[in-house]
UniProtKB/Swiss-Prot annotation:
Homodimer. Interacts with host CD247/TCRZ; this interaction induces down-regulation of cell surface TCR/CD3 complexes. This isolate is from a Gambian case of 'neuro-AIDS'. Residues 35-45 have a biased composition (Low complexity). This is Protein Nef. It is a lipid-anchor. Disulfide bonds: none annotated. Belongs to the lentivirus primate group Nef protein family. The keyword Lyase does not apply. Residues 140-156 are annotated as: Mediates dimerization. Factor of infectivity and pathogenicity, required for optimal virus replication. Alters numerous pathways of T-lymphocyte function and down-regulates immunity surface molecules in order to evade host defense and increase viral infectivity. Alters the functionality of other immunity cells, like dendritic cells, monocytes/macrophages and NK cells. One of the earliest and most abundantly expressed viral proteins. In infected CD4(+) T-lymphocytes, down-regulates cell surface expression of CD4, CD28, CD3, and MHC-I or MHC-II molecules. Residues 11-21 have a biased composition (Basic and acidic residues). Residues 1-70 are annotated as: Disordered.
Length: 257
């Protein structure tokens, strides 16, 4: 039974990368790294680099983090709007979501630390996210895919604010967002299209950076988002309210009173 379930999951997941790439263009493009050199992103995945730590799973609680669209009671309308947007995406982008069931295949459940670890490695092994340009549309596709295929409630995928590397705010999710400089050759040849994510990603981002997903297994052991930016967790940060609000204000990050 286990092998059969694993096979079915593998078959369903193989189309995730294709759906993401069809969302306004591909993700294979030359990029400039921090040292000034160029690198091309391959579409092949690899196996796990490290085993998941033996830790107790952490469950999501409403209001726990800062940038989920519905973290406060006052944002219920935003939550409903976000869910409606996911539904609209299915209607408007059917070609991008071929094979995604309308209803979840399994009962709905909250994301946990262990589940985030497992899903991160599973997606990596299938070549899912590595080097793909981030966009709001692709963010929703990933949410929708894991909701319909794995029953994971889409309230977990959140990243720290920029500029710079954006770390996942859900401990256990091993994919971070890294800003890249697109090479001139890539812009002229491969991404000479206004709707390509290499072009639109910078407009999605408030800091004007082009972001790509990168797998980082060390995020299973180090809660980078909380270590580097505790103020983004608000009351959960353990900081005095005046202090975390002052830090958010200094960084230009909005917060609810």
């Amino acid at each position: 039974m286990g092998a059969s379930g694993s096979k079915k999951r593998s078959e369903h997941s193989q189309g995730l990368r294709e759906r993401l790439l069809r969302a306004r263009g591909g993700g294979y493009v030359k990029q400039r790294n921090a040292s000034g050199g160029e690198s091309s992103q391959s579409q092949e995945g690899s196996g796990r680099e490290q085993k998941s730590p033996s830790c107790e799973g952490q469950q999501y609680q409403q209001g726990e983090f800062m940038n989920t669209p519905w973290r406060t009671p006052a944002a219920i309308g935003q939550k409903n709007s976000y869910k409606q947007q996911n539904m609209d995406d299915v209607d408007s982008d059917d070609d991008d979501l071929v094979g995604v069931p309308v209803m979840p295949r399994v009962p709905l459940r909250e994301m946990t630390y262990k589940l985030a670890i497992d899903m991160s490695h599973f997606i990596k092994e299938k070549g899912g996210l590595e080097g793909i340009f981030y966009s709001r549309e692709r963010h929703r596709i990933l949410d929708l895919f894991l909701e319909k295929e794995e029953g994971i409630i889409p309230d977990w995928q959140n990243y720290t604010h920029g500029p710079g590397t954006r770390y996942p705010m859900y401990f256990g999710w091993l994919w971070k967002l890294v800003p890249v400089d697109i090479s001139q050759e890539a812009e002229e040849v491969e991404t000479n299209c206004l709707v390509h994510p290499a072009q639109t990603s910078r407009y999605d981002d408030e800091h004007g950076e082009t972001l790509v997903w990168r797998f980082d297994p060390m995020l299973a052991y180090s809660y980078k988002a909380f270590i580097l930016h505790p103020e983004e967790f608000g009351h959960k940060s353990g900081l005095p309210e005046k202090e975390w609000k002052a830090k958010l204000k200094a960084r230009g990050i909005p917060y609810s009173e």
